[in-house]
Amino acid sequence: MPKMKTKSALKKRIKITGTGKIMREQAYRSHLSQNKTTKQKRQARKSVQMHSSDVKRFKALI
């Protein structure tokens, strides 16, 4: 059976660290930012680790 192709949409949105963790950007940043607090906007800049319940599913798509 041939290899599965990598999902391009996912490839653009995640980054795999050297230790194998999957990192993603946070949501709620693109628009309507005037209604959000400075703290919310600052914390949304950081990348976060993908939740453990999603990791297995996403690794199959990569």
Curated annotation (Swiss-Prot):
Q: SUPFAM superfamilies from the xrefs?
A: L35p-like
* PROSITE patterns per the UniProt record, alphabetical: RIBOSOMAL_L35 (PS00936)
InterPro entries listed in its UniProt record: Ribosomal_bL35, Ribosomal_bL35-like, Ribosomal_bL35_CS, Ribosomal_bL35_sf
Keywords attached to this Swiss-Prot or TrEMBL record, sorted alphabetically, are: Ribonucleoprotein, Ribosomal protein
Is Ribosomal protein given among the entry's keywords?
A: yes
GO MF, any single term = structural constituent of ribosome
Q: Which cysteines are joined by disulfide bonds?
A: none
Output compositional bias ranges, type Basic and acidic residues. Answer: 53-62
One Gene Ontology cellular component annotation held by this UniProt entry: cytosolic large ribosomal subunit
Gene3D superfamilies listed in its UniProt record: 4.10.410.60
Q: Please indicate which superkingdom the organism of origin belongs to.
A: Bacteria
Where are the residues of the annotated region Disordered? Answer: 25-62
Gene Ontology annotations of biological process type:
translation
Which PANTHER family does this UniProt record tie to the protein? Answer: 54S RIBOSOMAL PROTEIN BL35M (PTHR33343), LARGE RIBOSOMAL SUBUNIT PROTEIN BL35M (PTHR33343:SF1)
Q: Which family does it belong to?
A: Belongs to the bacterial ribosomal protein bL35 family.
Protein name per UniProt: Large ribosomal subunit protein bL35
The gene it comes from is: rpmI
